[in-house]
Amino acid sequence: MKFLQIIPVLLSLTSTTLAQSFCSSASHSGQSVKETGNKVGTIGGVGYELWADSGNNSATFYSDGSFSCTFQNAGDYLCRSGLSFDSTKTPSQIGRMKADFKLVKQNISNVGYSYVGVYGWTRSPLVEYYIVDNWLSPSPPGDWVGNKKHGSFTIDGAQYTVYENTRTGPSIDGNTTFKQYFSIRQQARDCGTIDISAHFDQWEKLGMTMGKLHEAKVLGEAGNGNGGVSGTADFPYAKVYIGDGNGGGASPAPAGGAPAGGAPAGNDQPQGPQGQQPPQGQQPPQGQQPPQGQQPPQGQQPPQGNDQQGQQPPQGQQPPQGNDQHQGQHPPQPQGPQGGNPGGSDFNNWSQGGSPWGGNQGGSPWGGNQGGNPWGGNQGGSPWGGNQGGSPWGQGNQGGNPWGGNQGGSPWGGNQGGNPWGGNQWGAPQNAAAPQSAAAPQNASDGGNCASLWGQCGGQGYNGPSCCSEGSCKPINEYFHQCQK
């Protein structure tokens, strides 16, 4: 009897050891691609994105999911990747979800605000959520990220402060009212496993209802309204996956994969209706401001994934004007009142009375400028509003960008072939589509574009490559098949 009681303990210890093995042994491996400009793409079935508003920047992405990001004199810079879904399944229907990451900071300087963690959306109800486990700035995001502080809770063995907002403004479903949820880790960590589902569970206990999952992505961002952000954020290990898996890679789906009907990494993501605008960013509730001198500079929008209301960097730390940042990633602007914008959005180009994020005519740091402000009304490719130049977040794209004027429902941009982030040249899917709910013969020829080891290769609603460059395609559940040895 005692022996039988010991077995679960030993198994738990073994699982924990495996789950953290990447913290000591992880290193880049596989094929690699180096990007020196803004780019959304895939490598070995893993989706990736590099975006910056200025500076001399680069990023190297590997087919094993790892990546290394270098920025010099940037105003705002981000790397991100993860899973996309079709908003038809709840988190419980999809399965337990986690994200593994290892972060190595090198020569980081002049960072005013930063977020490293998990970001995404749900529908029915419409929710924008944020799990922050680390940051490249000297200080973590503060109470100004939310207008309702639920308090501190132990989630997956660590203390997180949970915030909630109710916002009216741009979202993946257009200009509307939606919820924003935040979990901010009280002690940053450079390596570990984020139990995404555990945060969902805690939020549900607090009455913070989750809807049908639209995405879950790993995000790393650094910015400063004064510019000059420099350093390297190296991620020798990064994966988002469904199921228990382990740190060594058992059953993880590569970042960018799309179980539950979503598109494969970097391919066609569910597109939203025309006219969808990017969700307003991380502005604090009206009247709630962080200390002066910590605001992002006018016209500078943080990269996508960070447009949570209330999450604005302290005054003086606004991103520079004219920065086209990706939807959803605005640095939290520490300004309270919304200004006079018709819909209350801080990040759009409709406000006429000083909204910090958009459309205001009186010096709003985030909008109304005519020279490329990513958040409002610019005519030169602003990702957030009415741009005509293919901005991933703007209203002129034709592929369904949920953030603006897209025609096909893509949550992130007007791409023509499914680029999840925008109407840019990266949108066309490169992978041959496999029949939904049926995986093609394993290791069959797919034009040389087969999924990598641990990549998605089939499942209900999946339309990406169905062959494996290594191993064979095995069903995990009806929505997700994966290349495994």
UniProtKB/Swiss-Prot annotation:
Residues 34-234 form the GH11 domain. Residues 250-450 are annotated as: Disordered. Pathway: Glycan degradation; xylan degradation. SMART domains: fCBD. The active site is at E128 (nucleophile), E221 (proton donor). Residues 1-19 form the signal peptide. Keywords: Carbohydrate metabolism, Glycoprotein, Glycosidase, Hydrolase, Polysaccharide degradation, Repeat, Secreted, Signal, Xylan degradation. Glycans are attached at N56, N107, N175, N349, N443. PANTHER family: ENDO-1,4-BETA-XYLANASE A-RELATED (PTHR46828:SF2). This is Endo-1,4-beta-xylanase C. It comes from Neocallimastix patriciarum.
